[in-house]
């Protein structure tokens, strides 16, 4: 039987969660370190309104730059994010059935929920969570969101994050991400993951580790902090959150360059967390009016 391509995995997950009742959203057009940073998660998990969504999110982690030479670690990758609020009682069964939709036979594979409570210091977010392993490889993260921006989430939302590359490696039986079948075609139409993304991976790795201008990034970080605070004051939490995301990415770039000391790092994390918090507070304030 032909193995699912990378894009087929995404389409099947979209269809599965759409059939459950989720709205399929689009990726957020900003540099984020994980699917959780999408405002559809950060802002919409707050408050008491139901929220059922799913989306793919390209994510960037400058510190994971490896010039495209590492078999499964990249500075740019993809996650599939699901938010179910309020969390249904049968969430574990729903997740396992999503794996079955990807032709994973649960009777022949060792699926384990390994306790791993989740925390994002820069978002002031945390929750009870589990890593989901399939035959010893982590393929997903499962979290009951308890707080975001330091604010308690009620009702509690369930977040499921599929690591698409890891899942595809397992499904296709491949050891290196760049060798993944992207589109399931043969001949001149066939595409591998590496043909789509790895030249960018090489170039952005050089930029992140060698050519990024630290003084410019420091200025941009400061500017984004000031803009975020200013926009919150004029009741614009969504543009303000964009500036928070920019500040977070600039911090990650500075960290990848190695120009931030351990002591300074804690200060930067706290600064970004404070920005996320004021955005969340203002969002809640306006949405309750």
From Swiss-Prot:
Its main location: cytoplasm. It holds the Pfam family tRNA-synt_2e. The keyword Ligase applies. It catalyses: tRNA(Gly) + glycine + ATP = glycyl-tRNA(Gly) + AMP + diphosphate. GO terms for biological process: glycyl-tRNA aminoacylation. Keywords: Aminoacyl-tRNA synthetase, ATP-binding, Cytoplasm, Ligase, Nucleotide-binding, Protein biosynthesis. Its EC number is 6.1.1.14. It is found in: Cytoplasm. GO terms for cellular component: cytosol. It is an enzyme of class 6 (ligase). GO terms for molecular function: ATP binding; glycine-tRNA ligase activity. Belongs to the class-II aminoacyl-tRNA synthetase family. HAMAP family: Gly_tRNA_synth_alpha. Tetramer of two alpha and two beta subunits. PANTHER family: GLYCINE--TRNA LIGASE, CHLOROPLASTIC_MITOCHONDRIAL 2 (PTHR30075:SF2), GLYCYL-TRNA SYNTHETASE (PTHR30075). This is Glycine--tRNA ligase alpha subunit.
